[in-house]
Structures are given as C-alpha cells and as structure tokens.
Regions:
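Short, basic/aromatic beta-hairpin or loop at an interaction surface
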Residues: 10-25, 154-169, 203
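Aromatic- and glycine-rich peptidoglycan recognition patches
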Residues: 15-24, 35, 202-255
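Short, conserved secondary-structure segments in the cores of folded domains
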Residues: 33-34, 178
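SH3/SH3-like beta-barrel superfamily modules
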Residues: 34-95
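Surface-exposed beta-loop interaction hotspot
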Residues: 97-135, 141
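Catalytic cysteine-centered active-site loop
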Residues: 134-184
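...with weaker cross-activation on analogous glycine-rich loops/strands in unrelated enzymes
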Residues: 162-228
Length: 255
C-alpha cells in the first residue's frame, strides 16, 4: 500500500459522506464484482461495527476504526448507501471522491398522487436512456449502462423518488396489482422462485427494461407481455410473476 493511501486510511473516520463523483460499490472486499453504483451527490455511511487490526511481523501495526480489508491489488472499506440501505464495499482508492456530510441525508416523502404526477417523467427518463448507446451492466445504476433494477431505481430517482435496489426488493416495496390493472409507470416483475427481473410498464402491453446479453437484448429495449412476439419477449412473458405500483418513496431504516 502506498504511503499516501495509508495516510488516507489513518485519517478517514467512519460516518456519513457524500459522493463527489459516480462511484462503484462492490459485492465483496476484493472489489472484483460490481454490486451497485452511487451517483454523484448520493450519501453513504462508512460503517464502524468493529475494529480491524493490521499486523506486521506478528505485531499490531495500526488499528483502524472501521472495517477494512486488504485485497490483492488494493484495499476496501464496508459502506452502506443512505438512500436505499444497500450494503457493499468501496475501494479505498476512491476515498478522495468522498466528502464528509455537513447535513445528514433526509428522505423526502411523496403522496401517491404526487408520485402519479411524476410518472410521465419517469417513463421519459427510460426512453431517453434507451436512445443512448448502452449495454447491460450487472450492478449498473448510473447511465448509460444499467441492469434491470438499476434502470428502475435511476428513473424514479430522477424525479426524487427513491425505491429499493434489487428487483425482489422493489417487488416487496411496491403495492401489488393485477396484470389487468397495469397503468403506465407501474413495475412488472419476472422470475420463478423470486423476482429476478423488472421492467417499467408503458402501455398497450409493452414495457421497457434493461436485459442481459445471454437471454435478453444486452441493454435497454421495449418488449411485449405476449407469447405472440419474438423469442426474447416470449421468454420473459413465461417468467411473468406479477406487477406493482410505486405509491411511496423509500425511507431508510438506518438511523
């Protein structure tokens, strides 16, 4: 580890920070696979639930006040995103892109009618994203490349509404509705044992989503809830499990 990075670690305190740039958040301390992303301006907590002692030659060398992990080629710290309570690992090399929060994150509240008024903008966000060159990115929540639930989260966040991160979490968070009750801006969920994919309903049986390379369109596209369309639409339709309506904005459980 460089002396500059060591200095950052030694002087970095646990607490709430704001992102000065778009940041990658990983699913393990090794920072090899993307879990999610934190857009510029988002808040995160550097967690502090235990102390980590590094040793050199069998003797304690330094004690850090928050969970860190030494991985091949770098180091990481455990974090939790404030807006959706999503946990992950941040590379210590990105510490310079954080600033301490002077004002803690406070979730906004919206009535169901206020959310309904914003749905045309939510839909417009996804359609604009589709017009840009993009591909499916596992863990992607920052344009131009998204995963399915990341696109949904970003679209609602664009109008100030927060929803959970993953498809199964979004399903549990939304108000269940029948497929026959679908309206523009509702969420449609796919998967067998649990929701593993999500899209945004448009109209006339069509929905917009970001799907993968192997079994999808490798990016954002519009498909139909029908067995009469192409193979990809049919494949997802066979996994259709339900629909949900966003009637509130997520409020973090962490205090």
């Amino acid at each position: 580890m460089s002396s500059n990075l060591e200095f950052k670690i030694q002087n970095f305190k646990s607490g709430e920070y704001q992102c000065l740039a778009d940041l990658n958040i990983y699913d393990s301390p090794s920072c090899e696979r993307l879990a999610t992303q934190a857009a510029t301006g988002r808040h995160l907590w550097v967690t502090s639930n235990y102390q980590d002692v590094e040793t050199r030659g069998g003797e304690p060398a330094r004690m850090t006040a928050f969970p860190t992990h030494q991985a091949t080629g770098g180091a990481s710290v455990q974090v939790c995103l404030c807006e959706d309570d999503y946990p992950g690992w941040l590379s210590l090399s990105d510490f310079s892109l954080l600033q301490p929060c002077t004002v803690p994150y406070k979730a906004k509240t919206f009535s169901e009618s206020e959310i309904k008024k914003r749905l045309p903008e939510v839909i417009a966000f996804t359609q604009k994203a589709m017009q840009q060159s993009n591909y499916y990115l596992w863990g992607g929540t920052v344009g131009p490349n998204y995963d399915c639930s990341g696109l949904m989260q970003a679209a609602f966040a664009s109008v100030g509404i927060r929803i959970p991160r993953d498809a199964y979490q979004q399903e549990a968070f939304s108000q269940p509705i029948a497929i026959t009750e679908l309206q523009p801006g509702d969420l449609v969920f796919f998967g067998f044992q649990k929701a593993t994919h999500v899209g945004l309903y448009l109209a006339n049986g069509c929905y917009i989503h970001s799907s993968g390379k192997d079994k999808g369109r490798n990016g954002i596209a519009i498909d139909s809830l029908s067995e009469q369309e192409d193979e990809i639409s049919q494949s997802y339709y066979q996994q259709l499990r339900g629909a949900g309506r966003v009637v509130k904005s997520y409020e973090p459980q962490r205090r």
